[in-house]
């Protein structure tokens, strides 16, 4: 069937049924390509993030051949069909209730590397995403961010302060940062007016 073009091979023992389009054979959905890397025995072990979800977050329109997966333990990148699958170590536990927030935090983490968009444009979109989170989700996002690196917490703090969240959340993030460390993040003060308060340069 593979030789007849009815199904396409992804990797050893993994195939998908391709549809013909005007541009050629369709790609399989990202989730189908990596399903076995996201769940094992009914338990979540990873989640799509980075390049894989920038489109759904309206952070980029670019389609990438790299699929990124958040996992709790380091794994080497692998190749599967036309896709490269890269793994990002996630220090928080992975469960259905926090995947959405982990994806947002990963976008903050890689703000300077999001394709086909400037850091300022990405920051404007992140401001909107943070603003649309419920107060409860904002609290959970802050809690999850505490396991990320300092500059992610600083950028989250600046964004949250700009959108006017409760002081308790701002204080929690400020206390988690080292006294005089500065963070080089390429976002302008015109877009993020609170950046200097968080020692972002």
Question: Whereabouts are the PLM-identified features?
Answer:
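Hydrophobic/aromatic-lined pockets within catalytic cores
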Residues: 2, 6, 58, 109
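Hydrophobic alpha-helical interaction segments
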Residues: 94-201
């Amino acid at each position: 069937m593979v030789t007849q073009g009815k199904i396409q091979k992804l990797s050893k023992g993994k195939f998908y049924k391709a549809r013909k389009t005007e541009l050629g054979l369709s790609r399989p959905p990202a989730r189908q390509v990596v399903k076995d890397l996201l769940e094992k025995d009914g338990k979540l072990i990873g989640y799509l993030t980075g390049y894989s979800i920038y489109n759904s977050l309206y952070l980029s329109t670019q389609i990438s051949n790299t699929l990124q997966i958040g996992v709790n333990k380091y794994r080497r990148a692998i190749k599967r069909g036309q896709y490269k699958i890269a793994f990002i170590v996630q220090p928080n536990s992975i469960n259905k209730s926090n995947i959405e927030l982990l994806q947002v935090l990963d976008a903050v983490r890689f703000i300077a590397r999001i394709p086909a968009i400037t850091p300022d444009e990405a920051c404007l979109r992140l401001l909107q995403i943070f603003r649309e989170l419920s107060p409860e989700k904002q609290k959970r996002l802050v809690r999850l961010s505490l396991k990320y690196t300092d500059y992610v917490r600083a950028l989250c703090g600046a964004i949250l302060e700009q959108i006017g969240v409760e002081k308790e959340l701002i204080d929690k993030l400020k206390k988690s940062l080292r006294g005089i460390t500065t963070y080089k993040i390429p976002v302008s003060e015109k877009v993020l007016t609170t950046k200097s308060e968080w020692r972002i340069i």
